[in-house]
Amino acid sequence: ARFVVAKANGASILLAPGCCQSVAKRAVTFKGTYGEGEAARTQPLTFSFDRPLNKKPFQILAHRGGGRTSDLLPASENSVEIIQLAERLGATGVEIDIRQTKDGTFIIYHDINLNLRLTQKTGLVGAIESYTYDQLSVFVRLFNGEKIPTLIESLDVILNQTALETVWLDSKDVRDMPRLRTIQQTYLQRAAQQGHRLNIYIGLPAQEQVTQFEQLPNHRQLPSICELDTSVAKRINATVWAPRWTLGQQIPSTVAMQQQGRKVFVWTLDVPEFIQQFIQNGSFDGILSNYVPSVAYYHYVQK
């Protein structure tokens, strides 16, 4: 598709100093044409300005760095390349899966094992923690040819090449929680120095990770996301409570958490009808999804 805004259809408004503070309804019109598939662009299409987008603060969180490999995106899940695409898909933040290699390097990878679902065929088999990072870097490529990234590489890209606001570090297999905390604090400090508004949360999906987290000094002051029940979120002073969407909207619990100063993100919500319902409810602070364009659409058009 291709669209043009003529001077008479609002181009002068868009180019004026101080544009867009108070644009009248239908004062700006995009006119153009589109085609189906490889066909020529011959079908007319017009978009006219109706009202401003919803400005309510809300986190649109991309699962696995931007989306799943199985959804045939142009980059593999949990890759640096998909993180770089996340904003174009509508995300304001990303969730990435944290594991450690045999030599302790933090990497981004979802599954326990190397497999053909996530990687190209290789001679390596079995648990990813059985290999050093150098071995994985040399011999393994993700489904679309990318390297398995380290956590450091991923955070460098997020901080220096995107405007993403939220990073959810989903602790799939973390044997060194103190070092993960150090990395979190280092990048929070760098973001503050660069003027990049960025929240980095240590995700706690199960009791094992909560136990590790509680052993950290001053853990109650660390930014964290708790997927367990509200009593655990309160005990560890989690910054965010994150229930799964299949438990329902849980409005009383959500309101109680927010009254305690916590945010509430729901996961992993992919069905458009339910995305619309959860956004129209208006209680949540963010949604984690494999389909962030749908979340972005329903959020921004919400009145």
Could you say what each language-model-derived stretch is?
Residues 1-303:
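Phosphate-group recognition and catalysis centered on beta-loop-alpha active-site segments
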